[in-house]
Amino acid sequence: MSKSLKRVTRALTEAGLDCLIQEIGHATTAQMAADLVGCEIDQIAKSIIFAGSDTGTAILFITAGGAQVDPACASALAGEPLGKADAALIRTQTGFAIGGVSPVGHLSAPRAYFDRRLLAFDQIWAAAGTPRHVFGAPPGEVLRVSGAELADFTV
């Protein structure tokens, strides 16, 4: 088991969540992940990381799989212009590789925002620390454990 997967598993357990973690193979899109899990695309919780242009810190947006983050809304929420986060920043600040960024278990907890549309489902699926693993949990629990703020930031 990878260090990242162990860290996510530990974070979920410490939060009192008994989640099913599945190895689904390498999915490069939310639609591929949804097809492999057998759920709707919007039940896939994507963890999108931006870099604060002023602070240089990672800022996490947890969004429904079929949605796109609106850069203007995201910047307004963050209170600073946002830019693309490169692989080095993501790995250094979250501890995850691109494609495996989980909403929980970060090395350093980023500011995080949670897409309201995820609350429409009984269960959502999110990366579990690797591009090949996901965990399923009620969206309210993912919101709680992630420490994210509920917000509107998608188009």
Residue spans for each PLM region:
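Extended, low-hydrophobicity, polar/charged segments
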Residues: 1-155
